[in-house]
Amino acid sequence: MEDVRFAVIGAGMAGLACAHELARADAKVTVFERARGLGGRLATRRIGPLAFDHGAQFITTRSRSFSRHAETALRAGMLDAWRPRIMEDDRAWPAPIEDWWIGQPGMSALVRPLARNIEIHGGVAVHELIPSQRGWELQTDSGRQNVIFRAVAVAVPAPQASALLGPHGRAFQQITDVRMAPCWTGMFAFDPPIDAGADARRWTSGPIVWAACNSSKPGRPQSPQCWVLHASSGWSREHIDLDATAAANLLLRAFEDCLGCRLPTPVHQDAHRWRHAL
């Protein structure tokens, strides 16, 4: 019997959900992910005792199938509800109608059940899809894979997908029309803690659009107090070529401007550049 294999490029939520469904149908699946970890933007940065959910801040469940997945994760202790005090600009914001869910102990816990019993190659970037008579071969960092895949699912940001799929038909060339927005994320730890007026704050204008006290989330370290800031897409695009140190310094100053006060020197600060955030 022919050994039929499928490849999935990208180990974020979409890629792992695809791989999981293929595996449930008894297909042989291999996932390739250029990052070392799973989850894509469902990410938590850990530095010693500190934890920053520096990608997606929470998830909501709106589809029936995803709600079932969330219920399974909740029963397994991999999910918890976050009910922060929220402000928008300088006004209190009503509590969300739908629950905000976070992964436990980190955001990537939401996708780990999807990855069970699936062959995953982390830290491996796929650079080219090579058609053959029986399917597809993959060119990666480590060279040409000695495997023929019947089909390949590409679950990566549009610019990366375009580079892989563009040479294989006009329909794929439309991917180049997709424009994705970047996001600089700032990560700051304070000891003693600061009072920003709420656990999560939104701003409708200015460099920062979101600030969240990560320490207000269930299961996250309480001390030192950790904060995550998301810059606007416009500010992020304008400063896309900064290094992380310079970006963190600017984001801290912008946070002070938003709060209207000087903040103590953080015991830790860093920044992460999401080139393809939204």
Locate each region found by the language model.
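Beta1/beta-strand and adjacent pyrophosphate-binding region of the FAD-binding site
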Residues: 1-14
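Glycine-rich FAD pyrophosphate-binding loop
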Residues: 9, 20-48
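N-terminal FAD cofactor-binding segment of flavoenzymes
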Residues: 21, 43-86
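Central helical "cap/lid" subdomain
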Residues: 39, 145-201, 261-264
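Short beta-strand to alpha-helix junction loop
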Residues: 58-65, 83, 87, 91-113, ...
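A conserved short coil-to-beta-strand element within the FAD-binding core of flavoproteins
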Residues: 122-137
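Active-site substrate-recognition segment that forms the wall
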Residues: 187-242, 246-260
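Flavin (FAD/FMN) cofactor-binding core of flavoprotein oxidoreductases
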Residues: 249, 253-278
